[in-house]
Every structure is written in C-alpha cells, then in structure tokens.
C-alpha cells in the first residue's frame, strides 16, 4: 500500500482515538513540540497550528511516510514544521529543547524501550510533557484477534521488535517511563473502534493490503487463500455498522507524564 490515499487511510482508521489525544495535547503558542513516529504528519501539522510561532519536529523511520507528510504540510502552508528521518531511540535530538513530546501509536516498536524513552526524556526540558497513545494488551484488541482468527494457522506473530502491544501492560510501562526520567505517569483507558472503511468491500481491500495479511495469504495455496479471504469477508461483515462503516473494537492507553526536574 503506497498511494497517497492508502497512506492517509491510517489517519481515518484512528480518527476516534485521535480526538482523545488532541484533547490531552495542551499545546500553546510558542511551544516547541516533538512528534515521535509522526507518519504522514497529521498530528505534526495539528501541533504546528497550535504551537505557532513555536516549531514542531516530526520524526519517523519511514521515508515514504515523511515524503507524504512534507507534501501535506507544504499544501497547508505551514512554515514551522521540520521532518527528520530517524529512530527516536537513537536519534540525536538537541538536549532539553522541547516543551512537549507527543506520539499517536508511534512508540511501541523500539528495540530497547528503556533507552528510547531516556533519549526522548533528554530531548525535553525539565517539566516538559509527554503525551502518548499506545495499544493495550492484545486480549483487549478485537480488531487484531478477529483478523487472526479468520486467517487461522496462517496468521503470523510479529517479528521481534515489531509488537504493537509491547507497551500494553500499564504497570510495566510506568516503570519504563519512571526509569527514563519521567514523573507521575498516568494511564487513561481509551475504548474506541478501529474504523476499517466505509463499506464491506473497502474494508476487505484495506485488511488484505496489510503486510501481515498479505504475507499470511501468500503462505497458502489458492483454495486455502480463497477460504481465508471469505472468512475475512464474513468477519468484517459482522462488524459493518452502516453509519460508520466497518468498525472493530479496540482499547488503548492515553499516557501522560512529566519530565523530571534535574534537581529532583
């Protein structure tokens, strides 16, 4: 999936979750903001509008996503945004240069979360704010379980370092943040649907385009693949809400924390 419309689908898929993140930003004029795992830049551009004349830096590991982000940012005429290709775990941020660090599902894939959040903490000024959305544990996310069940034995576990639910344990994640230099991490339960398309055909095309789904189907013979696709269609049909399209249940954490003062 590489066209602009397919890249932008991720924003539509998560629009219900995004409203919770937006309400927690607290970004004001003059703030310096870091957007971690910024993707195509929806959150970055939104932060830029609230922070102006402050600057916003969006970081992502995908050059393709960043190219789309730059296109959309230029189209909106936002001059206070910069995008950087890099992994926030090891990226060389200017120390103590940001007031707020935000991320919408962009912090779950670090190979070393302790090092990553320590690096992010170092980029924040003392008492700077961290605002994240991360998925809760797999058993609370039907949007993945339903697809895996339809794929059956062909469903594949994520490779090491690619687990979207790696921060789903609130107690373990709180300890990571505290070790990294953050105080008072708070976890708000966000219970919203993942939106997979305006109708059944669109939803099936989207799900078949996922890397994990296409890889699973590629491991099956033609008859097995056809059966798996039919099970996917049936599963998605059972979640067609008409008003919002195909919607599957999910749970995530809205996490807020504050960078510890150096003299604390």
PLM-predicted stretches and their roles:
Residues 114-115, 125, 129-198, 214-219:
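Conserved catalytic/acceptor-binding region of the Class I
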Residues 51, 110-111, 124-126:
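Helix-to-beta-strand junctions that scaffold the AdoMet/dcAdoMet cofactor pocket
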Residues 89-100:
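A short acidic, Gly/Pro-enriched loop at the edge of an enzyme's catalytic core
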Residues 99-114, 136:
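A short SAM/SAH-binding and catalytic strip from SAM-dependent methyltransferases
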Residues 180, 204-205, 252-264:
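Core SAM-dependent methyltransferase catalytic element
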């Amino acid at each position: 999936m590489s066209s602009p419309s397919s890249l932008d689908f991720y924003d539509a898929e998560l629009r219900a979750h995004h409203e919770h993140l937006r309400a927690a930003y607290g970004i004001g004029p003059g703030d310096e903001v870091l957007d971690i795992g910024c993707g195509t830049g929806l959150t970055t551009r939104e932060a830029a509008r609230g922070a102006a004349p402050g600057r916003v830096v969006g970081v992502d590991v995908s050059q393709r996503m960043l190219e789309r982000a730059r296109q959309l940012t230029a189209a909106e005429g936002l001059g206070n945004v910069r995008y950087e290709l890099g992994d926030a775990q090891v990226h060389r941020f200017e120390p103590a240069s940001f007031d707020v660090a935000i991320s919408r599902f962009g912090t779950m894939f670090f190979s070393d979360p302790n090092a990553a959040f320590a690096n992010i903490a170092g980029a924040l000024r003392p008492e700077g704010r961290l605002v994240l959305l991360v998925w809760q544990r797999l058993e609370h996310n039907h949007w993945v379980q339903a697809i895996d069940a339809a794929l059956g034995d062909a469903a594949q576990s994520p490779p090491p370092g690619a687990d979207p639910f790696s921060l789903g344990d609130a107690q373990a994640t709180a300890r990571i943040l505290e070790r990294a230099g953050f105080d008072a991490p708070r976890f708000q339960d966000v219970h919203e649907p993942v939106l997979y398309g305006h109708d059944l055909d669109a939803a099936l095309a989207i799900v078949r385009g996922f890397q994990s789904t296409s890889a699973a189907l590629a491991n099956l013979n033609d008859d097995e693949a056809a059966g798996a696709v039919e099970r996917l269609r049936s599963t998605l049909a059972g979640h067609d809400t008409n008003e919002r399209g195909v919607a599957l249940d999910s749970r995530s954490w809205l996490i807020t924390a504050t960078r510890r003062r150096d003299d604390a």
